């Protein structure tokens, strides 16, 4: 699709239209065809790489620009860039059935790849292959949600797969070095957030090497910072605790 806008007659090519309805009105934005899904998945963060123009239209193909009063009524603002972001995130991408199916298949593969990268079999500590995760997702009839990021959906998939197979997030290995004064008290607060304590050394300071669920990292980091007034240290030894070697579970 190619269009001319009536204001500046700039020719727009490779256009993907995202449409939303608000307050009884239709609003559209012109995007680069291959960038919309990247924005929604979080892979693309530069809005200028996604939008062909920071203009909200009533009809992109005819170049009809939305009226300011309609924008304010529907979105509560006339900031076109912010409105574009809302439409980009929540609107419906206008594509052919074939294009939509291709995009959904790509998102399905991307979700499976994230799950395979982040998870292991808890008994063997071996990672799963992407092919096996794809097969498991099909077995639970997982349906891709085009308006949600692949990372969010990967977390959903992990939760659902736990009901049918041995799978869990690979643990992170951390080292804490804590001042003696706060060490014992802080250790008790950290215990519920720790999966396994692998090593503990208590001399001039308390040093702990442990495994945690990645979802607890931020809470642990904030707890150590606040309780030690910045005197404690937290070191990530490995992002994924997996068995060494090339073997993967098929």
From Swiss-Prot:
The modification N-acetylserine is found at residue 2. InterPro entries: Ribosome_mat_SBDS_CS, Ribosome_mat_SBDS_N_sf, Sdo1/SBDS, Sdo1/SBDS-like, SDO1/SBDS_C, SDO1/SBDS_central, Sdo1/SBDS_central_sf, SDO1/SBDS_N. Pfam families: SBDS_C, SBDS_domain_II, SBDS_N. It is found in: Cytoplasm; Nucleus, Nucleolus; Nucleus, Nucleoplasm; Cytoplasm, Cytoskeleton, Spindle. Disulfide bonds: none annotated. Its main location: cytoplasm. GO terms for cellular component: cytosol; nucleolus; nucleoplasm; spindle pole. The keyword Repeat does not apply. PROSITE patterns: UPF0023. SUPFAM superfamilies: FYSH domain, Hypothetical protein AF0491, middle domain. GO terms for biological process: bone marrow development; bone mineralization; cytosolic ribosome assembly; hematopoietic progenitor cell differentiation; leukocyte chemotaxis; mitotic spindle organization; rRNA processing. One of its GO terms (molecular function) is ribosome binding. Keywords: Acetylation, Cytoplasm, Cytoskeleton, Nucleus, Ribosome biogenesis. Gene3D superfamilies: 3.30.70.240, Ribosome maturation protein SBDS, N-terminal domain, SBDS protein C-terminal domain, subdomain 1. PANTHER family: RIBOSOME MATURATION PROTEIN SBDS (PTHR10927:SF1). Associates with the 60S ribosomal subunit. Required for the assembly of mature ribosomes and ribosome biogenesis. Together with EFL1, triggers the GTP-dependent release of EIF6 from 60S pre-ribosomes in the cytoplasm, thereby activating ribosomes for translation competence by allowing 80S ribosome assembly and facilitating EIF6 recycling to the nucleus, where it is required for 60S rRNA processing and nuclear export. Required for normal levels of protein synthesis. May play a role in cellular stress resistance. May play a role in cellular response to DNA damage. May play a role in cell proliferation. Belongs to the SDO1/SBDS family. This is Ribosome maturation protein SBDS. It comes from Gallus gallus (Chicken). The lineage of its organism: Eukaryota, Metazoa, Chordata, Craniata, Vertebrata.
């Amino acid at each position: 699709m190619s269009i001319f806008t009536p204001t500046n007659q700039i020719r727009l090519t490779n256009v993907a239209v995202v449409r939303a309805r608000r307050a009884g009105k239709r609003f559209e934005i012109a995007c680069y065809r291959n960038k919309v899904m990247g924005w929604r998945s979080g892979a693309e963060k530069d809005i200028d790489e996604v939008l062909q123009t920071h203009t909200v239209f009533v009809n992109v193909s005819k170049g009809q620009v939305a009226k300011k009063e309609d924008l304010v009524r529907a979105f509560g603002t006339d900031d076109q860039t912010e409105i574009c972001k809302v439409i980009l995130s929540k609107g419906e991408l206008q594509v052919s059935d074939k294009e939509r199916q291709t995009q959904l298949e790509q998102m399905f593969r991307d979700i499976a790849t994230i799950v395979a990268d982040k998870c292991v079999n808890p008994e063997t500590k071996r990672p799963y292959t992407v092919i096996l995760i794809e097969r498991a997702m099909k077995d639970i009839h997982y349906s891709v949600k085009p308006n949600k990021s692949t990372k969010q959906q990967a977390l959903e998939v992990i939760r659902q797969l736990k009901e049918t197979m041995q799978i869990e997030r690979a643990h992170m290995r951390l080292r804490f070095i804590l001042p003696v004064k706060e060490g014992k008290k802080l250790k008790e607060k950290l215990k519920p957030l720790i999966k396994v304590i692998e090593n503990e050394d208590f001399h001039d300071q308390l040093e702990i090497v442990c495994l945690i669920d990645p979802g607890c990292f931020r809470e642990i980091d904030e707890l150590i910072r606040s309780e030690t007034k910045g005197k404690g240290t937290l070191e990530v030894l490995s992002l994924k605790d997996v068995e060494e070697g090339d073997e993967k579970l098929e």
